[in-house]
Curated annotation (Swiss-Prot):
Keywords: ATP-binding, Magnesium, Metal-binding, Nucleotide-binding, Nucleotidyltransferase, RNA repair, RNA-binding, Transferase, tRNA processing. CDD domains: NT_ClassII-CCAase. This is CCA-adding enzyme. It holds the Pfam family PolyA_pol. It is an enzyme of class 2 (transferase). A single active site specifically recognizes both ATP and CTP and is responsible for their addition. Belongs to the tRNA nucleotidyltransferase/poly(A) polymerase family. Bacterial CCA-adding enzyme type 3 subfamily. HAMAP family: CCA_bact_type3 (MF_01263). The gene is cca. Its EC number is 2.7.7.72. Disulfide bonds: none annotated. It catalyses: a tRNA precursor + 2 CTP + ATP = a tRNA with a 3' CCA end + 3 diphosphate; a tRNA with a 3' CCA end + 2 CTP + ATP = a tRNA with a 3' CCACCA end + 3 diphosphate.
Length: 400
């Protein structure tokens, strides 16, 4: 199972070997192959230096030359090829002060984070496992390569990566490894929020998120991270996979706060999505009629509302009041969405300029209120979305 990507990349290994160097598949792709999981990306490790890789292949991109990584472009696909390397002491709990190249596979593998990620495989699917990674896979255990405290001291992100693997793979964190996490957890404050968010997005969607989330709480992880440290995270529960945006919206709703999302350094689209989810969670329980539901679907979008309904159990776990299932059911929501006369204010056959012309009034907050009322009346079928009818509505309802 899952040999196709390896076979596609096999000629790269063969070409490196033809020039007298070693080359292996390594890391997550090998781990997932051994677990019969879907394989996303292929990483290659080699005894050849970046200069030697660039001389072997016609098309390369030096994406991380200083760290030994060259992108080899083969048949339209990019493959990261990294030289066997060892690392000097780490600085700032996140990066080595120096990287130097070696010619020994075992020396390269021993610098990696967890035993399940320190397994290599050659072009013929022979496994090279010096640190009992396969044993850990069979026992469903997350365990560091070598001394756990040293691994986490080198790069504190490995703590979060370990919890992320626990969530994604449904594994258990080995006892000494978890104790080392506790010992080094304060080092998390040295990490960039961007690196943390990348890992949290994967962790929160994992099949074993409930245990990983409890471990995050137990480790006091959130006390060391901007945005989260201002929230009472011990109040929150996540017992099933959820998107990052939904999770953050739950935190805001539980805390009854509008804490700024700027500390998370996420995209504007993600911020917008979180704020929409947050408003839906707050306002949903107040919707008590089909007419109100129609406006709600128009304002927030069918898909966003369905996203919230799908996590009702998580909302209840967090003592967030859920919407009435008699009103908020998939059939009603889809039916309303299908028959909405307009989907945005832009679809109204009247605009602010039209209203100003027939009222001879100056623009102001009143104009926005009038347009909103027109939206409501069109959506509730009190007036058709026809220009003449809408102009007539303005003359009858707006004092000139």
């Amino acid at each position: 199972m899952g040999t196709e990507l390896f076979n596609q990349a096999k000629p790269i290994l063969e070409k490196i070997e033809q020039h007298g160097f070693e080359a292996y598949f390594v890391g997550g792709s090998v781990r997932d192959y051994l677990m019969n999981r879907h394989i996303h990306d292929i990483d290659i490790t080699t005894s050849a230096t970046p200069d030697e890789i660039e001389s072997i292949f016609e098309k390369t991109i030096p994406i991380g030359r200083e760290h030994g990584t060259i992108n080899v472009v083969y048949q339209g696909t990019n493959y990261e090829v990294t030289t066997f390397r060892a690392e000097a002491e780490y600085v700032d709990h996140r990066r080595p002060s120096e990287v130097y190249f070696v010619r020994d596979l075992k020396e390269d593998l021993q610098r990696r984070d967890f035993t399940i990620n320190a397994i290599a495989m050659d072009k013929n699917f022979n496994i090279y496992d010096y640190f009992e990674g396969d044993v850990a896979l069979n026992q469903h255990i997350i365990k560091t390569v070598g001394d756990a405290k040293e691994r986490f001291k080198e790069d504190a992100l490995r703590i979060l990566r370990g919890l992320r693997f626990q969530s994604q793979l449904n594994f258990t964190i080995e006892g000494d490894t978890f104790e080392a996490m506790k010992h080094q957890i304060a080092d998390v404050e040295h990490l960039s929020i961007e690196r943390i968010v990348v890992e949290l997005k994967k962790l929160i969607k994992g099949q074993n998120v409930s245990q990983s989330y409890l471990n995050l709480i137990d480790l006091n992880f959130f006390n060391y991270v901007p945005f989260f440290r201002s929230l009472d995270m011990k109040q929150t529960k996540v017992n099933s996979p959820i998107s990052f945006e939904l999770w953050i919206a739950i935190l805001l709703t539980v805390e009854q706060t509008n804490t700024s999302l700027s500390d998370l350094k996420i995209s504007n689209n993600e911020k917008t999505k979180i704020n929409q989810y947050h408003k839906i969670m707050i306002e949903m329980p107040q919707v008590s009629s089909k007419e109100q539901l129609k406006l709600f679907v128009y304002d927030y979008g069918m898909n966003n509302i369905i996203d919230i309904i799908a996590i009702n159990s998580i909302l209840e776990d967090n003592n967030i009041k859920i919407a009435s299932p008699l009103i908020f059911n998939l059939q009603s929501i889809k039916e309303i969405d299908q028959h909405l006369p307009i989907r945005s204010r832009r679809e109204l056959n009247i605009n602010g300029g039209d209203i100003l012309r027939i009222t001879s009034k100056k623009s102001g907050p009143w104009l926005k209120e009038v347009l909103r009322q027109i939206e409501i009346d069109v959506l509730t079928n009190k007036v058709p979305n026809l220009k003449d009818e809408l102009l007539k509505w303005v003359k009858e309802n707006v004092k000139i």
